[in-house]
Curated annotation (Swiss-Prot):
It is an enzyme of class 3 (hydrolase). One of its GO terms (molecular function) is nicotinamidase activity. This is Nicotinamidase 1. Catalyzes the deamidation of nicotinamide, an early step in the NAD(+) salvage pathway. Prevents the accumulation of intracellular nicotinamide, a known inhibitor of poly(ADP-ribose) polymerases (PARP enzymes). Coiled coil: none annotated. Belongs to the isochorismatase family. Expressed in roots and stems, and at lower levels in flowers, siliques and leaves. It catalyses: nicotinamide + H2O = nicotinate + NH4(+). The keyword ATP-binding does not apply. Pfam families: Isochorismatase. One of its GO terms (biological process) is pyridine nucleotide salvage. It comes from Arabidopsis thaliana (Mouse-ear cress). Optimum pH is 6.5-7.0.
Length: 244
């Protein structure tokens, strides 16, 4: 019998992402939700250089799960922080092509999350770099994200968004380092909700025809992003439930 196991299947066996038990949240959880870059420029078909060119199931599911989770949090008046990728046209973010330029529709929340703009529980933070922690820094040395954590007394941070292996991972890794360094009190845990994350797809055969592009197979890089986040100390879960 032929062996139809793919290289990806073999990789998952070598670097498995052993997910934690389902995360159960209640009014005593002291939890905050961080949504990373769920904007048109990464999620809405045809909305720029980094957006999908056709329906993408992983990205669509991520948007759906992120919106659902945000609604659950806001209904309970729990804090939500949404990072919004926003770049100046004269400051490129290499190696990526121009994307999410300030003042364009690319740099706006997707329609499914646009309602967050009028929610009292939501803090929106535009950032001009991959790492939301760094993008939260102000010229006076303060940090919007750190201040949000301290003001809301957040012990558990739940993270969703795009891209799993880039902006999500960079933020998670830095938040964990800050926690370990004692500058993110009272945070105890950072939880990555796998079904609420996604990354972009650039297969090798397509990347070969784009000067300077690196191949970025979606399923593989999503898995690697989750694996790396767990290796840094994050909890990775595929199910979140709420106690009444």
């Amino acid at each position: 019998m032929a062996n139809h196991e793919t290289i990806f299947d073999q990789l998952k066996k070598q670097i498995p992402v052993d997910e934690e038990e389902p995360l159960i949240l209640n009014r005593d959880s002291s939890v905050g939700l961080v949504i990373v870059d769920v904007v048109n420029g990464f999620c809405t078909i045809g909305s720029g250089n980094m957006a999908p060119t056709k329906h993408n199931e992983q990205i669509s599911k991520m948007v759906e799960e992120s919106a659902k989770l945000a609604r659950e949090f806001c209904d309970r008046k729990w804090p939500v922080l949404a990072f919004i990728d926003s770049h100046h046209p004269d400051i490129p973010e290499r190696p990526y092509p121009p994307h999410c330029i300030i003042g364009t529709e690319e740099s706006e929340l997707v329609p499914a999350l646009k309602w967050l703009e009028s929610e009292d529980c939501a803090t929106l933070r535009r950032k001009d770099c991959i790492n939301g922690f760094v993008g939260s820094m102000e010229s006076d040395g303060s940090n919007v994200f750190v201040d949000w954590v301290k003001e809301k007394q957040i012990k558990v941070i739940v993270v969703v968004g795009i891209c799993t292996d880039i902006c999500v991972f960079d933020f998670v890794a830095t938040a964990l380092s800050a926690r370990n360094h004692g500058v993110l009190s009272p945070v105890e845990d950072v939880v990555v909700y796998s079904r609420g994350c996604a990354t972009f797809d650039l297969p090798l055969h397509v990347a070969k025809d784009i000067k300077g592009a690196q191949a970025h197979p979606q399923e593989l890089m999503h898995h690697v992003g989750l694996y790396m986040a767990k290796g840094r100390g994050a909890q990775v879960v595929s199910k979140i439930s709420f106690e009444t």
